[in-house]
Amino acid sequence: EKILCTVQKWCRPYPWTVKVAQGLSHFGEHSLGWLVLSGLAALTFPKHREQWGLAALSAFGSHALAVIIKRIVWRPRPHHPAIDVNVKTPSALSFPSSHATSTTSWATSAATISHNPLPLVLSPIMMTSRMIAGVHYPTDVAAGAALGAVSSVVTHKWGPAVLQRLRSRKNH
């Protein structure tokens, strides 16, 4: 709670940080923002359509996996008088952060597809926003980021082979 309280204390003089955190919360809810961006990227870059489809699959799949893990771990969200909760959440469970998971998954996918590390900055931005919003501990967002990165790597490593097998079965 100490780190979470410190993050919020640093941000209090800058009310815009709460507005940004709230906006990111809506964007990342159920990985919908990342699904939309994947669709737009697939339309914009048709040569990489399959890869952007895998990015969407990874973001959504990792989000779903994070929700399952939340129901196993059953860690409650932060609850402390010094912590301001600035967004509504669909559940009272905290570990891991689904927002950090799907964001890191998508950012890792985007960096892989574009051969550019710049999308990776999205992950710490979302991680910090979840603490500014007062709904996650640092370990929640760190675990979510790790889960998202692994999900993306696994999806892009094995996804093309799985798709190829599905296509070959369809043609037989």
Q: What are the residue ranges of the model-derived segments?
A:
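N-terminal transmembrane-helix/juxtamembrane module of multi-pass inner/ER membrane proteins
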Residues: 1-33, 66-93
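Membrane-helix interface segments
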Residues: 14-17, 31, 47-51, 79, ...
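Small-polar-interrupted transmembrane alpha-helices in polytopic inner-membrane proteins
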Residues: 56-72, 117-130
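Membrane-embedded catalytic cores of phosphoryl/pyrophosphoryl-handling enzymes
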Residues: 83-172
